[in-house]
Each structure stands twice: as C-alpha cells, then as structure tokens.
Amino acid sequence: MSRDFQSPGSSDLELTLIMNYSLLIAAYLDYLIGDPWGWLHPVQVMGWAIDRATKIALKYCTSPHSRRLAGVLLCWGTILGTGGVSWLVIYACQWLHPSVGIAIQSIALASCFAAKSLRQAAEDVLAAIASEDLDLARSKLQMYVGRDTDKLTIPEINRAILETVTENAIDGVMAPLFYAIVGMFIPVVGAVPLAMAYKAASTLDSMVGYRREPYADIGWCSAKSEDIITWLPCRLAVLSLSLISGKPLTVWRLCWRDASQDLSPNSGWSECSYAAALGVQVGGINYYQGQIQSKPLLGDDLQPITSAIIQQALNLTRNNFLLWLGLMTIYSLCSTFLSK
C-alpha cells in the first residue's frame, strides 16, 4: 500500500501501520500453511518467464558479449517487471476495496517467505532418518539439494540439511522481510513490490546464476545483482542472529575468519554464522553429477551435526524473523501513538 492508496484523512504513519498489519498476517499465513503443493506460486510464474526468455536468448545470442547484454536485459527486465506487475495488482485490489487490498497484500507477502517450506523440507528428511530408512532419506534430500545424494551417510545428510536451511535462511526468509520493511517506507512503492522484486532476483540467481556453460555469460548479471542486493540484509541478519544466539563475539570472530573463503559473498556468512552459533562445522567435499567439489570449512567442529542441531538452526531462523517483525511492529505502534 502506498500514498496512491491513501484514503481521506489517512496519514503516512497510519498507512505504515496498516502495511505492518499485512506483514503480521503474512507471517502468520506462512507459519500456518507455508506453500502448499499444487498451489500456483509467484515464483513458478517467474521461473516460467525466466526459462522462456533464457531459451530465446541462448538461441539467438551466440557471442559472449551479446549473451552478457541479453543477461542484463533478462535480469533487470524480470526484476523491474515483477515489481511493476506486483504494484499494479495491489493498486487494482486496493481500488476495488481497501480490505481486498490488505488481503491480497498479505497473501503476496506470505508467498515471499519460505520459513515453513524450509522447516517442512528439513523435517521431511529427518523423519526418514528417524525411521532408519537411509534410501528414503537420500531420495527426499535429492528433492531439495543439487548435490549427489545416492551415497551419502547419515552425518553427510545432516550436514546437507543444515547447509541448505542456513543458506536459504537469508534469501528465503530474512532478505524478503528486509525488503518488505524497506518498501513500507518508500513513497508510492510499498512492501509487496519490493519483496517480490527481491524474489525475482533470487529466482534468477537460482536458475541462471552459474559459472558453467551455457549460463556463464547470460547469468553473470543475475548472479552479481543478487549478491549485491542480498549483501546488506545478510549482514544485518548475521548481526541479529549473533545476538539472539547469545554468542555474538564467537559468531563474528568465526565469520571474519571463515566466511570470506566461500565463493559466495553471502551464503558463506549465513552458513558460518549458524555454524558458529551452534558449535558445528559445515563445508567439505560434495559431489555434483559425479564431479567432486570441495567447499571451505566454516566454523569449529565442536560437536556433530544431529537432528537436534538442525532443529536449533530452524528455531534460530524463526526467532530472528520474529525479532525483526517485532521491532517493526513496535516502531509502527510507537510512531502512530506519538503522532497523535
């Protein structure tokens, strides 16, 4: 909701409070139902558009230079287009009725958060491990990770789960929340368009942001752009996580020591912060399509990664999310109260 949606007598602070209500509803919806299988999701629409555009670009752009140019257009066309369409949808719904606008805004914001999905994915694999069905655990894990899982041991499966939930805690939970909050304070924009634009950037990175062919050139802009726009929310999330973990000095010491070894400027920080807070070590040797790939070791190996450790990581993400949401709500309430 933006100033364009302002009804007579409404102030900017009141609009911010209304958007905060939508954010609270969205958080509850994600907690309650997550992303049900079979329901159309905005990321699916983004993925379809990105896939079609990428195939066309790869077909007609044959030189590295032309592919890089096409990649820039693909990246920012998708990001700005997603934000623009989201703005129009929210505007149209608000024009129909303010209640419709709030409802659609809440649903759209809920679709940007993946906290429930991450927890369900992790617990799905952990349930197979608990039932002592290693083959089932491997097959379920394969649905969520890119590495080869057919020969993984239980400790390796646990490490893969932890790395997945801690890496995706930023781009799937904290960064969308960050941009939703930022959007609330930008005139005319609003929470949904900015959060959706971020999801578009994240989806682009996951689909084309690879160093291997045929994506090395066409995906270069998407990968770099996602790195840049995730940098600030990642560091803020690490800061707040270090505080709620009760080990701020340990988390920052190990992040400064280890995080920069990772090729990604953000996932290394995210994974390392959790590893430091939990007293475990992530990284090591993985196989992708039969090819060995070694990732830097992050954190100190003080204890093994177990299902209990993974649950602690999921709870840290939830508490971090609730901390940001709570601070935003307190700010909105105090600002509205003090302005009267």
What do these predicted ranges mean?
Residues 5-6, 13:
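Short hydrophobic targeting helices and cationic amphipathic motifs
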Residues 14-197, 201, 209-340:
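Hydrophobic alpha-helical transmembrane segments
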